[in-house]
Amino acid sequence: MLIKLLTKVFGSRNDRTLRRMRKAVSLINAMEPEMEKLSDDELKAKTNEFRARIEKGESVESLIPEAFAVVREASKRVFGMRHFDVQLLGGMVLNDRCIAEMRTGEGKTLTATLPAYLNALSGKGVHVVTVNDYLAQRDAENNRPLFEFLGMSVGINLPGMPAPAKREAYAADITYGTNNEYGFDYLRDNMAFSPEERVQRKLHYALVDEVDSILIDEARTPLIISGPAEDSSEMYKKVNKIIPHLIRQEKEDSDTFQGEGHFSVDEKARQVNLTERGLVLIEELLVQEGIMDEGESLYSPGNIMLMHHVTAALRAHALFTRDVDYIVKDGEVIIVDEHTGRTMQGRRWSDGLHQAVEAKEGVEIQNENQTLASITFQNYFRLYEKLAGMTGTADTEAFEFSSIYKLDTVVVPTNRPMIRKDLPDLVYMTEAEKIQAIIEDIKERTANGQPVLVGTISIEKSEVVSRELTKAGIKHNVLNAKFHANEAGIVAQAGYPAAVTIATNMAGRGTDIMLGGSWQAEVAALEAPTEEQIAQIKADWQVRHDAVLAAGGLHIIGTERHESRRIDNQLRGRSGRQGDPGSSRFYLSMEDALMRIFASDRVSGMMRKLGMKPGEAIEHPWVTKAIANAQRKVESRNFDIRKQLLEYDDVANDQRRAIYTQRNELLDVSDVSDTINSIREDVFKATIDAYIPPQSLEEMWDILGLQERLKNDFDLEMPIAEWLDKEPELHEETLRERILAQSIEVYQRKEEVVGAEMMRHFEKGVMLQTLDSLWKEHLAAMDYLRQGIHLRGYAQKDPKQEYKRESFAMFAAMLESLKYEVISTLSKVQVRMPEEVEAMEMQRREEAERLAQMQQLSHQDDDAAVAADLAAQTGERKIGRNDPCPCGSGKKYKQCHGRLS
């Protein structure tokens, strides 16, 4: 109450921010007459004037009023569009390292031109980040005339572009591209073998469109570049045959409940748990198939990989559904993005899950992959000097933006007041009743000439609604991952009178729905339209536009609630743009996933009390509140998962930064001989110390062991025992010096043969290759550590602290291995003539190119990472699922080391 009162008196933080910025808007408006007087050339010359002022030490911030006034005037001349005052406010918010919440239809694309131009003046580059290639291309081409008029270059960064084209795109003042492509380029740059192979510049300013989709929805999914591992496709096929024999039961066995099935599914945690009976049956079937020996346990350490295959196959059958989580196209399993409903071509699930789904669908199984490099979006975007974003719906996630990215959210007012009617939810008992009610609503609305947009959460649901509409004889368009090639065309005409459009998640569709359809799209469809044709198209559009306004604008139907209120708001936001009328309503049933998992008992209890009849709906504030609470629960759970992931990834991130900094320094220098000499000293000191402990008696020295080690690991034949016999005065220190001096001498002789330049080149190559190889192994080891670390909680230890401690120890060990491997490789190398070295380098490049083509870019869902390393030493004794776990945690085996992810 007190907070409300104080807000009324002093205004909220949002109001105060906008009040401060409105003063600058007045300044920009005051400059307008002055800018109008300038000729085109004088206006263009402003860019160089601003650049010169920045070079002399003026700050970018001090140029805001003038620079924004220049962009507004240029936009009037190039596009015939003048930035509204609210768009100027949005531009300032974006320059202020904040997130601008701007409603759909308020012109976010035009708003972005202001901070993009301003921040490009410093010459360090601006990255505009969009959710898909289509939008990156569209926005770049749409804004190119404006930026080029002002003397700015524009680049587009698309997947599959050759490196020179990418380098050119990044060298431009303003670069458009997708979040994935920027992230993958960063990883690829840190795998480059020469400075010329890198494409990105230093990361300066990122302007993220649909920022909630990129920084929140996709934050749980790391970007991964992986290379091929060993082939195990036959095993996936064999295990896949076994799974259909298993029967699912409703809930997990417990002291009070014993089911009849073989496994249970925890939908909330997306996990599958084998029952005691299931385990026995699987072991019998594995023995029958000849995969496992009789009397063996699936949980014995030797069967860890087999357990991994069984887990993956179970999850593929029980948790992943065709046309919801993936589609099968041209004999390939393609993932469907759960947030946007788009297909993710070339992406693969990790941990063998993709192969298990391929086996289930009977398509060709592709090899498993090994991680070569990975980063989360959270850590990638935090590398930018300056970060800002815009979206139609950020306010519900303001806390997360602030706590993780240190970004404040500012709600920018709309240019015209919003008059859309958001009707209360209707809840039905069954899915069929709900679909029927939706069809009736569509019939009623289209009879009045009102266009309808139906939002569904999966391809499967969109096809169910489509079939029912076809039965009812209602013409409609379907927009889902299967047909998104003609997506923009469908969206552009979704505002036609009585048009019906079904769409999977509308997040990130990026095209406004114009009431009466898009006359621009009709003009674009004609080859060489005359003035009369254009005038006629506009006149026809005006008639349709007025008819749709009279019918009540665009009506939105949601077929079920999403996990996040934000995505519901995005769907609603497609209607009522720029002060247009519109309406929206969500239809729900007790069979919807969200209701079933999170809100079922309470709401179905209410419905029974109210004595519902088939076909009847409940419309009550209590129900709406219960649903909002369910969504809040899911949102906070997802936030916790993302925060947890980030805390763990921060550990890896510090190491990644250290390795990448070291690697880039290596790339940028041509001579690493000083480094090599320094680490050679360290390596020989540590090697000698292992056999001749410092300050020890001669009886404790293992001279033969040292000679053997020097021969095997460094290819050095040294008669140390003979030296000691002949020269009694040789002591520990002088012996060390002699061994080191001899090793340097042998190395210098090799250098004389091939020449110093070739040797420097070779040293650098060895260091880079060794670093990459060890980093790859380190990433795999970190993955294993991460999967089993939660079990430390049973020993009253904080898993996060343990993870930090152990991963640091592993990192330190990796750096020691790096030194040892580099010196060992350089010592063992057989010297050849320069021509042969050149040929070997050529061979290495060809091999690198071949591997690059085999690399997979994936955007793996980390929630689904397989848990619990099953290396518990269970011995020969078979452990019951409900027995105490032998690790001593006090938990049941099935809930500890016997737990299936």
Swiss-Prot record:
Q: Which domain of life is it from?
A: Bacteria
Instruction: Give the Gene3D superfamilies listed for this entry.
Output: Helical scaffold and wing domains of SecA, P-loop containing nucleotide triphosphate hydrolases, SecA, preprotein cross-linking domain
Which InterPro entries does the record associate with it? Helicase_ATP-bd (IPR014001), P-loop_NTPase (IPR027417), SEC_C_motif (IPR004027), SecA (IPR000185), SecA_CS (IPR020937), SecA_DEAD (IPR011115), SecA_motor_DEAD (IPR014018), SecA_preprotein_X-link_dom (IPR011130)
Q: Which residues bind Zn(2+)?
A: C885, C887, C896, H897
Q: Name any cofactors this protein relies on.
A: Zn(2+)
Q: What is its EC number?
A: 7.4.2.8
Tell me the residue numbers annotated for binding ATP.
Q87, G105, E106, G107, K108, T109, D512
Q: Which residues cross the membrane?
A: none
Q: How does it sit in the membrane?
A: Peripheral membrane protein
Keyword Transport assigned to the entry: answer is: yes
Output the NCBIfam families linked to this UniProt entry.
Answer: PRK12904.1, secA
Q: How does it assemble?
A: Monomer and homodimer. Part of the essential Sec protein translocation apparatus which comprises SecA, SecYEG and auxiliary proteins SecDF-YajC and YidC.
**What protein family is recorded?**
Belongs to the SecA family.
Could you tell me which PANTHER family the record lists for this protein? Answer: CHLOROPLAST PROTEIN-TRANSPORTING ATPASE, SECA INNER MEMBRANE COMPONENT OF SEC PROTEIN SECRETION SYSTEM
What's this protein's name? Protein translocase subunit SecA
